[in-house]
Amino acid sequence: MDAGLNMADRTPPARPRPVEIAAPDTLLLVFSQAPDEDCARRIADALVAERLAACVNITPGMQSVYRWQGEVRRDTEVGLVIKTSASRFAELAGRLKALHPYEVPEIVAVRPDAALPAYVSWAVAQVRKPLV
């Protein structure tokens, strides 16, 4: 009898994972673009100040190629990666749309498959609505 197998189903014991899987509704990464760094900073400052984002990464110099109004366009934009919680996404998306100069801004949210639990806890705490 092999001590490393569960004899009921003959599967090896579960191995510990180096990074804990984040709960599906805890943390969201929201991707957007801004036309320039000043606009990106204004958006980031507002979202963090209003507790809609825990953190916003600003990445200048991104090249975007896309189709808009029947034409293929190429623009240099500033990338935004916004960290928020699933419970704050609707408010964040509405505010981002209001702050954004584009007619149809990119607002795409994804749930990470894995994240450092301490980071998830910190990020979610930053966007939690304060008790009144």
Which functions belong to the PLM regions below?
Residues 1-132:
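Positively charged, small/polar-rich N-terminal and surface patches that mediate targeting and assembly
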